[in-house]
Amino acid sequence: MRLTVQSFQRKFDPTDPNVKQKMNDYSETLIQQIDTMSAVASAFSNFASMPAQQNETLNVVEVVELAMDIFNEEYIEFHSDSPKIISKIDRTQLIRIITNLAKNAIQSIPEQQENKSIIVSVKKELNNVLITVADNGIGIQPKDIDRIFEPKFTTKSSGMGLGLGIIKNIIENYKGTITFETEFGKGTTFTVSLPIINS
């Protein structure tokens, strides 16, 4: 949202003949981002009671990109090989999944580390949409690898994350999968796969 406002400040020209249309486009973008932030706030409001899941037909690319707008870290990149990939999943739950994976990635990178990098990507592969969150943080210790998806398992003493066990359950409820690759000292990549709806 901050980037949207900054971009508008730089580009706004009151003498532009299309100023009304541009104001409308800008307003619609802000409304979308506010709705996304509201969904994120709702997703984080009560971890103990998971709301009933809804089946919504939505554009995964759009939802993931909007969810990433809440993060201010300049080293986070978003990529997609398509502007629209349709799946059936609860919007709030998808935002839960993405924001938690991104938050975990941010926390895995030491504050003092140079050349920080998190790449979030969405692509279509056969009958699935693949969402990957890759970081160049500290990675997962070998002793923790087999416990990552255990309920309530965490390597952090504090934080708002749902835990990967709950994230995994949400994904599996939508016939999806979550996997990861990690190298201790070099980083981790999580991949979420969900079935798509072919148009």
Task: State the predicted function of each range.
Residues 1-35:
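Histidine phosphotransfer helical core of two-component systems
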Residues 50-53, 86-89, 155:
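Conserved micro-motifs of the catalytic ATP-binding
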Residues 54-68:
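A conserved beta-strand-to-alpha-helix junction within the catalytic ATP-binding
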Residues 60, 139-147:
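Short helix N-cap motif at coil->helix boundaries in the Bergerat
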Residues 115-127:
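Short beta-strand/loop element within the Bergerat-fold HATPase_c
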Residues 163, 167:
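Short alpha-helical Gxxx[C/S/T] motif in the catalytic ATP-binding
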Residues 171-172:
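Detector for a conserved hydrophobic position within an alpha-helical segment of the HATPase_c
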